[in-house]
């Protein structure tokens, strides 16, 4: 993949990454569909090696892709280890069921069944009658629960036999799916309220993961696969990582000793299709018990418009090609778990709040294989999923640390290169150390400057580099450079001759004729897999058979013309160097003598004075903030003597500031805190900062009678201008009152009633849970801080019903918070030492509460752990008030959403009436012009109906939503867009003109015409809004370009321009179009959603400002439909 280095203000690192990812997904999906179709048609004769050539084959029909998606997401079969019921969520009437359900639920006895038994499992029957009363109540209650998956599994019993099942529920578009898995009689059943118990299965594994040192991703993955292997007992457990180009790699493995190793194996992107990756995001754990088992068909209500969606079903059947792949590698059963991390590329702008939920992206998979059939009960699978969530949190930290380390390295190298450039540009960055090769990972670099070459490392020859420079000037003269991981795909004619030396290249212009090149060799040089060394002859039919060894061959074939991709952070570094060079050298065209010119840096003295003035301002402001802070803050020098002591510290200890300054800190702490303080000081001198450490300060004067002051502190190193550590600052949180209550609780050995019922204002917020995770107590302080009354939480699940991800209960900001809370509760209930957690949630008024949560185990008279007692230490009222102000806008957004929901519902009926009226008019005898107007009217209604169904904005934002593919006439769609803009244009007395060639009227395409209409109409309305009558017309311009792909297939590359008079749309609104934030305006949200829809259609949006005009530029491509004699003549209506 190649990309020009253009300087565009709207481009960012994250948008670049998203564009590349979207392009790969779009490119891979038709290939996946084609391979699937070929497998289905050939079955056992399928040639796996064709996956290599599939990527360069001609196009795939949209019907093939649609059929493929339907098969992947809406298959008609399940695995036989359980049965499936689909019901209406309100009435529990049956919508669909699997053919094995009657047998599993004991509705088909050997005797002649009764009428009730025959009718109990029929479409339209009430499913609750199939289970005993207590089970029916549990299912009914679960159906009313927002996040129903948090209640899984629900233990139910069949009415006739009492046979126990785990009911695993999830919602789909038409109702509620209930997967029923029989409970093994020898297992102790886990009830819904006891879902917390399944976490205990993974408690030790979680502890081991959390105890690992940071900075070692390989060790983290090795421990994970080992723990999963011990938990599940599979013969082989592997950790897969997806690389940026979508191919996968086995980065860790735990296997049975006699099995072939797969560690280091790379496989092409087509091995795990994009549709499967989408399913892994929907269903985090996927089990196949026996890939050779006979599948079970689903019977569904004939009135359902399409087959049942099985994306979230635990029973979804395996696809034929996957089952054959497993069989070929000697695997009968498998368990696959997705590894997701925070998608920081979703938002590249700091919104000023960390409380907005971030999206997730698929980082990789943990894959388990077994050589015989294997069933893992749901509670154990749930424990594995929980373990993977913990791993995801740890992994997120590792990914962030690695990215930060890489950026720090680049910044250090850039600083040194800049210093060299001041003395000798640009030759110095090649002849001195470090040099330009140290900036980014590469195999060689070249400087082409004033018709001379300077080479480092492995590079093409001088003549070849000059040829590349000439090619860049002739073919990419409008850009400032080029980056590509494949010179072949970039179109360089001499790429084949360079393959053994160079495949990838990043090139920048430093003047009109001078370049710097970075080169990378092909990926295969960096690939090491032990399995490649001892390949048996014809073990896999020379790569034709689906097998990991064939996957490796296919991967090597795919990447033989490709290098490791250039990362965004690397391209940022290269681009920054380019800007420095272009600023320090005069362009050759402007300097006929070809003399280098170095821009003089400001005098050192001036810079130092300027820096000191800025530092003084910042220092004064920091001192003021520390002195007035509502938290205790103290500081010491390198000798450990106090040199900072704010008003809050003086208030708590009774020791005035002037008495504290200059005294050793160890003289002010109690005896059992001296070692802790010494350790903190020693670590700080080495540059290591500590968090959440407890120290006890002595009390003085009037506070002496209150005993020691207990602080939870974070340490941070104070440094001078040369980065030398000169002291330590402690920021603390007063836990004295809370600690006193907990000590009292410990002394009275669990007599919590005296504490929880105590009305004293000094009693902190307290709640309690039993060993099943249900809430037992919720004291007055907890009611006050959350706004939730005691009776509303008693007997409810703490995680899922009290603390939730939704608008009921106490909402937390993200799934990671619930995961951390679950870890803490599980650890304490399992008997581990008490822990603390920084914990935040929203109260019933939408105010965000930040607190420190401390959890202690509850023990009964026999010494058995019966649950946990939890104390919240909440931030000061001043901080709460500030957070409340910050969240007022969020509350307003919630109210707006409710109003929008009402309007959304009320619009449906009149819209249905309008559509009915139009349908009555269609058979009427109308003129050609009237028929065109009617057609545009119907398209407008279809577009409105489509928008009204857009309730899942998250799927739109993540570009995961499903697009329709229909044949449509482009001019009809464009005329419909113009019709939507004309009323506002007439109102503002602004004319709307169209500018497109006559061929548009005859152009029929495949794609989602309604989404295209929505996008263009919104951008047109925005242009109208910011245009004044006297400024000129608005023009909808279309520039088509057809490209032949293979024989008989064409792609239409379309450039839509909505040209309007300058100054155009305000810059702030354009920024909102590309960067969504909580304070987004109504117009900005509409533009943002349209931009996401365009990305989902594999297109891009730009906004161009010129001297007299501004333009929305939308670039999209659609397959051209084949000619059909049934089509109506092209539209020629004018506006």
UniProtKB/Swiss-Prot annotation:
One of its GO terms (biological process) is red, far-red light phototransduction. Residues 1-26 are annotated as: Disordered. PROSITE patterns: HIS_KIN, PAS, PHYTOCHROME_2. Residues 618-688, 748-822 form the PAS domain. InterPro entries: GAF, GAF-like_dom_sf, HATPase_C_sf, His_kinase_dom, HisK_dim/P_dom, PAS, PAS-like_dom_sf, PAS_2. SMART domains: GAF, HATPase_c, HisKA, PAS. Residues 1-11 have a biased composition (Polar residues). Residues 216-399 form the GAF domain. Contains one covalently linked phytochromobilin chromophore. Keywords: Chromophore, Photoreceptor protein, Receptor, Repeat, Sensory transduction, Transcription, Transcription regulation. GO terms for molecular function: phosphorelay sensor kinase activity; photoreceptor activity; protein homodimerization activity. Phytochromobilin binds at residue 321. Homodimer. Regulatory photoreceptor which exists in two forms that are reversibly interconvertible by light: the Pr form that absorbs maximally in the red region of the spectrum and the Pfr form that absorbs maximally in the far-red region. Photoconversion of Pr to Pfr induces an array of morphogenic responses, whereas reconversion of Pfr to Pr cancels the induction of those responses. Pfr controls the expression of a number of nuclear genes including those encoding the small subunit of ribulose-bisphosphate carboxylase, chlorophyll A/B binding protein, protochlorophyllide reductase, rRNA, etc. This is Phytochrome C. It comes from Sorghum bicolor (Sorghum).
């Amino acid at each position: 993949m190649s990309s020009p280095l253009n300087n565009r203000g709207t481009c960012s690192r994250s948008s670049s990454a998203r564009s590349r990812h979207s392009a790969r997904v779009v490119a891979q999906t038709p290939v996946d569909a084609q391979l699937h179709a070929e497998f289905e048609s050939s079955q056992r004769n399928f040639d796996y090696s064709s996956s290599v050539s599939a990527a360069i084959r001609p196009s795939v029909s949209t019907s093939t892709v649609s059929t493929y998606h339907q098969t992947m997401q809406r298959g008609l079969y399940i695995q036989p280890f359980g049965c499936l019921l689909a019901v209406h969520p309100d009435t529990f009437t049956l919508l669909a069921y699997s053919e094995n359900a009657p047998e599993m639920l004991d509705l088909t006895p050997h005797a002649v069944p009764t009428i009730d038994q025959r009718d109990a499992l029929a479409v339209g029957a009430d499913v609750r009658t199939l289970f005993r009363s207590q089970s029916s109540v549990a299912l009914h209650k679960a159906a009313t629960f927002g996040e129903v998956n948090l209640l899984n599994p629900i233990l139910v019993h069949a009415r006739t036999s009492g046979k126990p099942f785990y009911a695993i529920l999830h919602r789909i578009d038409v109702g509620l799916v209930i997967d029923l898995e029989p409970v093994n009689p020898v297992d102790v059943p886990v009830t819904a309220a006891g879902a917390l118990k399944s976490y205990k299965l993974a408690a030790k594994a979680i502890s081991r993961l959390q105890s690992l040192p940071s900075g070692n991703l390989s060790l983290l993955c090795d421990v994970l696969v080992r723990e999963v292997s011990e938990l599940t007992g599979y013969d082989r457990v592997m950790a897969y990582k997806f690389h940026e180009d979508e191919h996968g790699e086995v980065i860790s493995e735990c296997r049975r000793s006699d099995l072939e190793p797969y560690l280091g194996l790379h496989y092409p992107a087509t091995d795990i299709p994009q549709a499967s990756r989408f399913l892994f995001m929907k269903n985090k754990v996927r089990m196949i018990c026996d890939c050779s088992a006979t599948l079970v068909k689903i019977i569904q209500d004939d009135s359902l418009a399409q087959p049942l969606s099985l994306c979230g079903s635990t029973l979804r059947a395996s696809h034929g090609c996957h089952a054959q792949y497993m069989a070929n590698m000697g695997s009968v059963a498998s368990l696959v778990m997705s590894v997701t991390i925070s998608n920081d590329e979703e938002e590249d702008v700091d919104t000023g709040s960390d409380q907005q939920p971030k999206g997730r992206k698929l980082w990789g998979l943990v894959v388990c294989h077994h050589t015989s059939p294997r069933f893992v009960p749901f509670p154990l699978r749930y424990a594995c999923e929980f373990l993977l969530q913990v791993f995801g949190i740890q992994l997120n930290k590792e990914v962030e640390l690695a990215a930060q380390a890489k950026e720090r390295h680049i910044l250090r190298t850039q600083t040194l290169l800049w210093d060299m450039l001041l003395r000798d540009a640009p030759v110095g960055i090649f002849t001195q150390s470090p040099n330009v090769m140290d900036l980014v990972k590469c195999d060689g670099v070249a400087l082409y400057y004033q018709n001379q070459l300077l080479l480092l490392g492995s590079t093409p020859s001088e003549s070849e580099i000059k040829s590349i420079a000439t090619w860049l000037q002739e073919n990419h003269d409008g850009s400032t450079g080029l980056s590509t991981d494949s010179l072949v795909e970039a179109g360089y004619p001499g790429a084949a001759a360079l393959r053994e030396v160079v495949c990838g290249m990043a090139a920048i212009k430093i003047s009109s004729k001078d370049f710097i090149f970075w080169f990378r060799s092909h990926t295969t040089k960096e690939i090491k897999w032990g399995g490649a060394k001892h390949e048996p002859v014809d073990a896999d039919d020379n790569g034709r058979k689906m097998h990991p060894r064939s996957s490796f061959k296919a991967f090597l074939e795919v990447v033989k013309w490709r290098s490791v991709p250039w990362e965004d952070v690397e391209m940022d570094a290269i681009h920054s160097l380019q800007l420095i060079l272009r600023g320090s050298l005069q362009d050759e065209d402007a300097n006929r003598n070809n003399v280098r010119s170095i821009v003089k840096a400001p005098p050192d003295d001036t810079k130092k004075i300027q820096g000191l003035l800025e530092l003084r301002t910042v220092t004064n402001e920091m001192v003021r903030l520390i002195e007035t802070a509502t938290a205790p803050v103290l500081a010491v020098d390198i000798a450990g003597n106090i040199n900072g002591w704010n008003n809050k510290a003086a208030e708590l200890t009774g020791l005035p500031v002037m008495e504290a300054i200059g005294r050793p800190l160890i003289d002010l702490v109690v005896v059992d805190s001296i070692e802790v303080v010494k350790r903190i000081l020693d670590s700080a001198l080495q540059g290591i900062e500590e968090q959440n450490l407890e120290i006890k300060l002595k009390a003085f004067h009037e506070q002496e009678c209150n005993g020691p002051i207990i602080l939870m502190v974070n340490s941070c190193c104070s440094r001078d201008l040369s980065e030398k550590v000169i002291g330590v600052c402690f920021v603390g949180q007063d836990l004295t009152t809370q600690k006193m209550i907990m000590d009292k609780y410990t002394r009275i050995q669990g007599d919590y009633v005296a504490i929880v019922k105590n009305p004293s204002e000094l009693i902190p917020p307290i709640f309690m849970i039993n060993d099943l995770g249900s809430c037992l107590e919720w004291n007055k302080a907890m009611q006050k801080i959350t706004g939730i009354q005691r009776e509303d939480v008693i007997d409810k699940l703490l995680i899922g019903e009290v603390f939730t991800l939704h608008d009921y209960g106490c909402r937390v900001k993200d799934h990671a918070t619930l995961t951390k809370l679950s870890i803490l509760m599980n650890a304490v209930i399992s008997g581990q030492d008490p822990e603390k957690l920084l914990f935040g949630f929203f109260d019933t008024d939408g105010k965000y509460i930040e607190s420190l949560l401390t959890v202690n185990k509850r023990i009964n008279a026999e010494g058995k752990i019966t649950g946990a007692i939890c104390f919240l230490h909440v931030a000061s009222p001043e901080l709460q008030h500030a957070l409340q102000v910050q969240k007022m806008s969020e509350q307003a957004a919630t109210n707006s959403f409710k109003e929008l929901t009402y309007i959304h519902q009320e619009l449906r009926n009149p819209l249905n009436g309008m559509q009915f009226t139009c349908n009555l008019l269609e058979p009427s005898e109308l003129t050609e012009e009237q028929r065109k107007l009617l057609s545009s009217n119907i398209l407008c209604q279809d577009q409105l109906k489509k928008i009204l169904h857009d309730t899942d904005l998250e799927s739109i934002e993540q570009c995961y939503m499903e697009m329709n593919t229909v044949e449509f006439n482009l001019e009809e769609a464009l005329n419909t867009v113009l019709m939507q803009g004309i009323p506002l244009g007439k109102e503002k007395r602004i004319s709307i003109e169209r500018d497109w060639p006559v061929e548009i009227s005859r152009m029929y395409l495949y794609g989602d015409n309604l989404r295209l209409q929505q996008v263009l109409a919104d951008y047109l309305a925005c242009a109208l809004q910011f245009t004044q009558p006297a400024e000129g017309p608005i023009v909808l311009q279309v520039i088509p370009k057809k490209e032949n792909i293979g024989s008989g297939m064409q792609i239409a590359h379309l450039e839509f321009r909505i040209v309007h008079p300058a100054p155009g749309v305000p810059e702030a609104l354009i920024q909102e179009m590309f960067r969504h934030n909580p304070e987004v305006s109504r117009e900005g949200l509409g533009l943002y959603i349209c931009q996401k829809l365009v990305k989902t259609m594999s297109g891009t949006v730009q906004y161009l400002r010129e001297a007299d005009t501004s333009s929305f530029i939308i670039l999209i491509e659609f397959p051209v439909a084949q000619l059909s004699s049934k089509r109506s003549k092209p539209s020629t209506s004018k506006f």
